[in-house]
Design a protein with these regions (language model features):
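Short, charged, amphipathic alpha-helices and their helix-cap/turn boundaries
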Residues: 84, 103-108, 147-150, 184-209
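Active/ligand-binding-proximal structured segments within catalytic/core domains
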Residues: 129
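Active-site helix/loop module of the DD-peptidase/beta-lactamase fold
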Residues: 120, 138-181
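N-terminal leader/targeting segments and the immediately adjacent pre-domain N-terminus
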Residues: 1-113, 142, 170, 174, ...
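Loop-to-helix entry region of an early transmembrane alpha helix in multi-pass inner-membrane enzymes
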Residues: 115-119
């Protein structure tokens, strides 16, 4: 099913008990369009989550110096002239924040999202983790040449045994892993089921996961 853009009329996805069957989220495809336009801001209604509290002693207030950048023109990957606003529309963006030199210069939200909305982070989590790890390495608290099992002994009986922290950062650990999202029986597909990210496909053997 085709997704909907921010300027399109929002379809009646999950509008209560009276929601027509065709607009109820299929759990096997909750992270695919058009469903992800709703689920990415309502992930707690799809998957179990947990609150991670911040340390109130280490909070930095954001400084703002807002500018309208949506009319800025640039060339897209096809060499065609486009604007920031068009790019945000074409990429189904929910929220867009630009932070430069300690200041927020642009902040905008779409598809019903607000500054206080909870939104799934997906692989942004890897970027945050790597950034924090880089800071810890700079402080001498992590050794990139150390074996990953030194920090996570739980991985000793896995394919990660023998890989260094640097291998993991560079994605050169050599672990065999198929990341074909459209193949249900791929490694990433099996991991999704084993981690309860996705339900067991109908007709599958639960022992495969």
């Amino acid at each position: 099913m085709k997704s909907y853009k921010n300027t399109d009329k929002i379809p009646p996805i999950m509008l209560g008990s009276s929601t027509p069957k065709e607009w109820r989220i299929p759990l096997i495809d909750w992270d695919r369009p058009p469903w992800n336009r709703w689920t990415f801001q309502n992930i707690r209604q799809i998957l179990p989550t947990a609150n991670i509290k911040r340390n109130k002693n280490f909070v930095s207030e954001l400084k703002y110096n807002l500018h309208n950048i949506e009319d800025i023109m640039f060339k897209d990957t096809n060499g065609k002239d486009t604007s920031v606003s068009t790019m945000l529309e074409d990429t189904y963006t929910d929220g867009f924040l630009v932070h430069i030199d300690g200041q927020v210069i642009h902040e905008s939200y779409y598809n019903g999202m607000e500054p206080s909305s909870l939104h799934i982070a997906q692989s942004v989590s890897k970027s945050v983790t790597s950034t924090v790890a880089g800071i810890l390495i700079g402080r001498g608290l992590l050794d990139p040449g150390q074996m990953i099992t030194h920090y996570l002994p739980e991985l000793e009986n896995t394919a990660w045994n023998g890989a260094t922290l640097q291998h993991v950062f560079d994605m050169t650990s050599g672990v065999k892993f198929s990341e074909e999202y459209d193949v249900r029986n791929s490694d990433i597909g099996k991991m999704d089921v084993a981690s309860s990210w996705k339900p067991i496909p109908e007709g599958s053997d639960p022992n495969e996961y």
